[in-house]
UniProtKB/Swiss-Prot annotation:
Keywords, in A-Z order: ATP-binding, Chaperone, Coiled coil, Cytoplasm, Nucleotide-binding, Repeat, Stress response
SMART domains to which the protein is assigned, alphabetical: AAA (SM00382), ClpB_D2-small (SM01086)
The UniProt record lists the keyword Metal-binding: no
Gene: clpB
Region Repeat 2, annotated ranges: 85-144
Protein name: Chaperone protein ClpB
Subunit and interaction comment: Homohexamer. The oligomerization is ATP-dependent.
């Protein structure tokens, strides 16, 4: 076996990199210095691992070696075929071979190469580090092991390489505080102390705080708040993706995992944390191979390996419950989603950390709004994660505003720029008529420039005060961490000096500056550093597209006027609108069931009386846009097989990936009015589907995803019993009796029983028709105004249109046709013939029982 065959894979890779470096630098020979630079460039290599444990500026060392390489002679033509290893490099490899034999290794490892040739690198390393200290560190990384395989030196310090030490992070105060979850942490410690099967697995939905519970354990270990058995333990999070990454050959992943397990067994004080533990099932498996789960099983069963797993309930069912041998080795701990109050406690605990990070103040009202609004409007995620995200994003938005120029100052600067341009244009024209305007511009510019100077001075002053407050906060945070460190090391004198002398001194200064800042805020400051509930509502609005004001208290006052607002669009249906308004008011007052839709209504009545228009008006009023109306024509679902289109096709059928027409629409617009038009035309099985929505406020689509209907208003329209409603001779009691009879024939009792209101729309009378003509004409008026033409319609003309377009059986729809014929067609002709121009007025009046336009 020659020298090169005795090299480990990692040393071979280092040599290949050294050759590539020599080619890049156009050097004729590969030297030990090229080898050193190649090792410094390998972030996963043993040299970098050793240097990271020492107080060394690695980047400065790299630059020093780079400058040494630049001194080497360059040749014009060099290729991989004619490049040579110089004598010094071959000698260095032989030196490493000698050390290999002394150590009892079977292959030349990278650390052996470094240790055998430290004298070659001393001149370049000495200014940056103690070479004896480096030798000691390299020896400690070996931990007395011998290299018996080509791949063995890749797995030295496997745990360091593929894991993140959470206890070390807790020691350095790099973990967020963990609030609550005491019960779960105690149960986890209980399981870890067991003799066998001492492996807890945390189960819970994404975002409920599984990883935080493990971080809480790491913090308790550091603070010595754990039983004696766990006192000196290290919690190391295993990075599975890093373990799999770069495993080129079959069995390499398994080899790495085995080394990690061996290291954990030998150290005896490591608790391995595997997040997303379901990924170990099948990881690394190939034909005839063994997956990671099977490698872990024996060690887990014997209690040699302390492991904490974390996964979701869905993944646990999918992977663990199928593999009973793996399942019985873990003890499940279920983490439920915290309540709003528990989430609020967590947010209050994280408040200081977030304030320090973003350099702002977070009001308690913002924390309350975050917990409540996220629970109410962001239904596809879980507390506390979604509430923390809201606070974090709101704080980031505020920080951006703080670091940008204030809007008021920017506006003044833009105004100055605009006036300067106008001034230059007037100077170029040099007309006498421009003199007055020029004087006005000069006066405005003078005032604006003065205002700009004042605003800039105010901005600078506020910035200085804020910077000083931020600096003091950072210093106090640093002092608190220092005091914690002294306490842990038992130096209580130093800790007391910090807590009772240095921190109070800083707090006093900070209070004075805070008082100054508050005075600035009261006097109309340019900078706002406090996160409020309005900021949180704004972020929720960006996420969900729900208008901001809908989430705030001011909306309740607006809802009081809902009836009059709806009557502006829907005429002659006072009774129906009153019933709708009452249901909406109940919801806004918080008296309706929060697990059901905001309201569910069945609108009955003949065609053209305002059923669909009421739904549109409601969408406009509640959500500021008709676009928040999800309209589904139920006549498309007459056949039984078509019903599946509402929730999505079953697996294996065409359209499965597309989702359901109803469920997808509500998922995209969770805050909307859902209108199921002409519902009696649909197949009867549709109503079975709607029972779940009306009762529980959610519907499960074909993919098993739960779609929330709690923020929707469900309106079903129907022409059932329209005959009874059109009968003039029938009394109100007889009409109601006929309606009930018709409903019983068409709908099942369990469906009718779940509706909030069954609302009857009456046939329209002549007075209502005239009002509708007015509303329809307003739309024509708006279109004409866009062209700069003002049009009017007198009362007699309205009556004539109402008379021509009214039909008791067809409702208000024929009115549109009458308006087209009697007004719009005539107006269109005048525009196309250029008889009317912009800023003209046209009055439509009655002459000889006909509507004629009069141009003014």
């Amino acid at each position: 076996m020659n020298l090169f065959e005795k090299m480990t894979d990692q040393l071979h890779e280092t040599l290949d990199s050294a050759i590539a470096l020599a080619l890049h630098h156009k050097n004729a020979e590969v030297t030990p210095m090229h080898m050193l630079f190649a090792m410094l460039n390998n972030s996963q290599g043993i040299l970098i691992q050793a240097l990271q444990k020492m107080p060394v500026d690695i980047e400065a060392l790299k630059l020093s070696v780079q400058s040494e390489l630049n001194k080497f002679a360059k040749v014009s033509q060099i290729s991989k075929q004619n490049i040579q290893l110089n004598q010094a490099l071959i000698q260095s490899l032989e030196n490493a071979q000698g050390l290999m034999a002394k150590r009892g290794d079977s292959f030349i490892a990278t650390d052996a190469y470094l240790l055998a040739n430290m004298n070659l690198f001393e001149s370049v390393l000495k200014p940056y580090l103690d070479t004896k200290e480096l030798q000691k560190t390299l020896e400690s990384l070996r931990k007395g092991r011998t290299i018996q395989d080509k791949n063995d030196d890749s797995n030295l310090e496997s745990l360091e390489k593929f894991g993140i030490d959470l206890t070390q992070k807790a020691l350095e105060n790099k973990l967020d505080p963990v609030i609550g979850r005491d019960e779960e942490i105690i149960r986890m410690m209980q399981i870890l102390i067991r003799k066998t099967k001492n492996n807890p697995i945390l189960l819970g939905e994404p975002g409920v705080g599984k990883t935080a519970v493990v971080e809480g354990l790491a913090q308790r270990i550091v603070n010595k708040e754990v039983p004696k058995t766990l006192l000196n333990k290290r919690v190391v999070a295993l990075d599975l993706s890093l373990l799999v990454a770069g495993a080129k050959y079959r069995g390499e992943f398994e080899e790495r995992l085995k080394k990690v397990i061996e290291e954990v067994k030998k150290s005896a004080n490591v608790i391995l944390f595997i997040d997303e533990i379901h990924t170990i099932v099948g990881a690394g498996a190939s034909e005839g191979g063994m997956d990671a789960a099977n490698i872990l099983k024996p060690a887990l069963a014997r209690g040699e390996l302390h492991t904490i797993g974390a996964t979701t309930l869905k993944e646990y069912r999918k992977y663990f419950e199928k593999d009973m041998a793996l399942q019985r080795r873990f003890q499940p701990i279920l983490l439920n989603e915290p309540s709003i109050n528990e989430a609020l406690q967590i947010l209050r605990g994280l408040k200081e950390t977030l304030e320090t990070h973003h350099n702002i103040t977070i009001n308690d009202s913002a924390l309350i709004a975050s917990a409540k609004l996220s629970s109410r409007y962001i239904t596809d995620r879980f507390l506390p994660d979604k509430a923390i995200d809201l606070i974090d994003e709101g704080a980031a938005q505020l920080k951006m505003q703080m670091e940008s120029e204030p809007a008021k100052l920017s506006s003044v600067k833009r105004s100055i720029q605009r006036l300067e341009m106008e001034k230059q244009a007037l100077e170029m024209e040099n007309k006498e008529s421009n003199h007055k305007r020029m004087q006005e511009i000069l006066k405005e510019l003078s005032d604006l420039k003065e205002e700009k100077i004042q605003l800039e001075a105010q901005f600078e002053n506020e910035k200085e005060v804020f910077k000083e407050i931020s600096r003091l906060k950072m210093e106090m945070e640093g002092l608190k961490k220092e005091a914690e460190r002294f306490k842990r090391n038992g130096d209580y004198q130093q800790a007391a000096e910090i807590e009772y002398s240095k921190i109070p001194e800083k707090e006093k200064k900070e209070k004075e500056l805070q008082h100054k800042w508050e005075t600035m805020q009261q006097n109309g400051a340019l900078l706002q550093n406090a996160l409020t509930e309005n900021n949180i509502a704004e972020i929720v609005s960006q996420w969900t597209h729900i208008p901001v004001q809908k989430m705030l208290q001011s909306e309740k006052n607006r809802v009081l006027n809902i009836e009059s607002e709806l009557q502006k669009r829907v005429v002659g249906q006072e009774k129906a609108l009153k019933a709708i308004a009452k249901a909406i008011k109940r919801n806004k007052a918080g008296l309706s069931d929060s697990n059901k839709p905001i309201g569910s209504f069945l609108f009955l009545g003949p065609t053209g009386v305002g059923k669909t228009e009421s739904a549109k008006a409601l969408a406009q009023f509640l959500f500021d846009s008709d676009k928040n109306l999800i309209r589904i024509d139920m006549s498309e679902y007459m056949e039984k097989h078509a019903i599946s289109r509402l929730i999505g096709a079953a697996p294996g059928y065409v359209g499965y990936e597309e989702g359901g027409q109803l469920t997808e629409a509500v998922r995209r617009k969770p805050y909307s009015v859902v209108l199921l038009d002409e519902v009696e035309k649909a197949h009867p099985d549709v109503f079975n589907l709607l029972l779940q929505v009306l009762d529980e406020g959610h519907l499960t689509d074909s993919k098993g995803v739960r779609v929330d209907f709690k923020n929707t208003i469900l309106i079903l329209t129907s022409n059932v019993a329209s005959g009874a409603l059109l009968e003039e001779d029938l009394s109100e009691a007889d009409k109601q009796k006929a309606i009930k009879e018709s409903l019983r024939q068409f709908f099942k009792p369990e469906f009718l029983n779940r509706l909030d209101e069954i609302i009857s729309f009456n046939a329209l009378d002549s007075h209502a028709i005239i009002n509708i003509v007015g509303i329809l004409f307003e739309n024509v008026q708006k279109k004409a105004l866009e062209r700069g033409i003002n049009i009017t319609l007198d009362e007699k003309a309205k009556e004539l249109i109402a008379e021509a377009g009214f039909d008791r059986f067809y409702g208000a729809r024929p009115l549109k046709r009458a308006l087209y014929e009697m007004v719009e067609d005539k107006l269109a002709e005048l525009i196309l013939e250029d008889k009317i121009k912009e800023n003209d007025s046209v009055a439509f009046v009655v002459e000889n029982n006909e509507i004629v336009p009069k141009i003014k």
